Structure formats: C-alpha cells, structure tokens
Amino acid sequence: MLGTETVHALRGVDLQIRRNEFTAIMGPSGSGKSTLMNLLGCLDTPSSGEYWLNAQKVSELNDDELARIRNKEIGFVFQTFNLLPRATSLHNVELPLIYAGVGSKERRERAAQSLEKVGLADRMHHRPNELSGGQRQRVAIARALVNQPSILLADEPTGNLDSATSHEIMQVFTDLHRAGQTVILITHERDIAAFANRQIHLLDGKIERDVLTERAA
C-alpha cells in the first residue's frame, strides 16, 4: 500500500523456468526483480496467481512448509557472503546440513565435496578473514550447493567484487550449470547477465523482454 493506493510490484507475470536453465533476471530499481526473486525463493507468497516448483503448488503453503521447501529445494547466494567469521570454510558450508539434522560424518564429506566443486579444496580449514572476497563468495556458493538444491538462486552475487573476480565467480556458476545445475541470477549488470543462456528483462512489474542468448547455443 502507498497511502490509499495499492501498488503491485509484479503485474501479470507469466514465467516458466525449466530444469538446467541458466537464467538472468534484469531490470532497473523498482522493476520488480527483487519481488520476483523473493517469490521464486519462497521467501514470499503472491497476492494472486500461482507458483509451482517441481510439480508442487508452493503459493498456498504455510510458513513452516515454505521453510522446508527453501532448505530442500533452493540454494541462496547473496551479495554479502553471510559467513560466520570464526568458523572455517568447512564449518560454514556444513551449517545447512546441521539444520537438516545430517550426521557429522556425512556433513563433513558433503561439505568437502561442495568446496571441491567451487575450487576451494585447499581452503577448507581457513576462516573468512584468511580468504579473498572471491574465495568467500565461493564458500557461500558451496554452502548453497551442499543440500543439492533444485535451484541455485543468486542475488547480485558479484556486487561486492571487482570486475576480474566477478568474472571468476560467474565462471563458477557457468561450470555448475554445465554440470546440470539450474541457476537463476538477479543482476542489473549486462556483462554479468551475459553469462546466462536466457535473459528476462523486467520493467514496471512486467516482463519487457525474454530472450535466449548466444551462450544458449
């Protein structure tokens, strides 16, 4: 609500994202991309319409059910790395598995495998202050992957990184996509969106353009 007027952040959005797509969602401030990310990530529910994820109608789930979906189906990567400062890379990656009740031996094995996927096998026992910005984001990506989510949802994941490190991180996402991971990227940077094989442009709460890029070929 804005005064007595209802403002709809998204209007008439009809969108299907297929398994193993690498999709970038773009748009200026106020375009609705953050709202769309919150809906896709089950952080919010739509005021009307439906959202289906893996044949499940999640738009009608309660908060507890949405929390279970988020933990099981969605891996989040944010602009800020959100790592525990006193914990090692390995322990930071283990955290979602601790919440899921996974035993310690399996936790360590899966966290180590996840760090290996992002090229940090030699940094497992380092703390965040011993890592570069790019390495910290790799830890965050490994943490997002450790529950083997259906979707990797990245919100401005290179926003705190320089251009060279940003491209290194985007190559990690590209490699994960080529290995079969579905990736949804929220960004306002064209050079970052160019790594995706599909670009969705939002404007004033509507899909303005939805295009496949050359990278999809």
Predicted regions located by residue number:
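H-loop (His-switch) and adjacent beta-strand-loop-beta switch element
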Residues: 199-212
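ABC ATPase nucleotide-binding domains
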Residues: 214-217
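ABC family nucleotide-binding domain
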Residues: 1-202
